[in-house]
Every structure is written in structure tokens, then in C-alpha cells.
Amino acid sequence: MEVWGGKSYFKVEFVDNPKKIVKSWREKGGLVVHLTMYGKMIDDMIDEITKASKNFTLPLLVVIGSEKVEGWYYYNSDYNIGIGNQPHSEVSALAIFLDRIYKGEELYIHFSDAKFYIIPQLKGKRVVKTDK
């Protein structure tokens, strides 16, 4: 986010006590979505999540587990959402979730705090530095 922007849009953290974050988020009125291959399929749930998120005071907190996620997260998240019910990478789960939440419009978001931006090319690459 330092280079490509999005600080006002996203917050990414590695934390020592993720359970504390989830508890606090929910206590403050936030919605927690846990991405897991064991959850309800995203296409069956995305409309409900989108509608529900509008009734909460905080933005969505997305929890993405790895191989050995504690059962606690399955019971303390508002939604357990499956991005397919086969093993997959955490990054791909987040990408698909964001695509569904933003209905594909995330491809056209331009962050005002970006230090660089890309001009799409059929061949080669073109990156332009901003004055930020």
C-alpha cells in the first residue's frame, strides 16, 4: 500500500493475538467474515453478506486462516465462507472474495495515494510515477 496506494481503503495487519481483534471487532459492531474451504459457498452467501455489512458500524473484517485454523474462528465469525470446497491459497480466497464484494468494480479503483500507476498495454509495460 506504500507504493500502490489504498491506505484509506484497506488495513492489513499481522497480529500476535487475532482472537482479541475478532472479539473487539464484534463488540464494536463489526462484521467478521472467515474465508475457509469448509464454509457456505460464496455465491450462495454474497448477497446476504453485502446486505448485512451495510447495517454494521465498522467495515468488514476478513479472517483468512491457514492449514490449522483453530475451531474458535468457525464459531466466532459471523460468516464462514467457502471459496470452493477444495484446498486453495489464502491469497486466491481473498481475491475471489473481494471480486464478489465489489462486483468486479475493484479492477477500476484508482487510489489517490498511489506513488505509481500502471497504463495498461497489449505488449510491454508502462508504469508512471505520480508526484506523491
From Swiss-Prot:
GO biological process: tRNA nucleoside ribose methylation
Broad class of enzyme this protein falls into: transferase
Pfam family, one: Trm56
Source organism superkingdom: Archaea
Disulphide bonds in the chain: none
Catalytic activity line of the entry: cytidine(56) in tRNA + S-adenosyl-L-methionine = 2'-O-methylcytidine(56) in tRNA + S-adenosyl-L-homocysteine + H(+)
Gene Ontology terms, MF aspect: tRNA (cytidine(56)-2'-O)-methyltransferase activity
Claim: ATP-binding is one of the keywords in the record: no
Keyword terms of this UniProt record: Cytoplasm, Methyltransferase, S-adenosyl-L-methionine, Transferase, tRNA processing
EC number: 2.1.1.206
Major place of residence: cytoplasm
UniProt GO cellular component terms: cytoplasm
Subcellular compartments: Cytoplasm
Positions annotated to bind S-adenosyl-L-methionine: L35, G65, S66, E67, K68, V69, I83, G84, N85, Q86, P87, H88, S89, E90
Function comment: Specifically catalyzes the AdoMet-dependent 2'-O-ribose methylation of cytidine at position 56 in tRNAs.
Similarity field: Belongs to the aTrm56 family.
Assembly notes: Homodimer.
Protein name as annotated: tRNA (cytidine(56)-2'-O)-methyltransferase
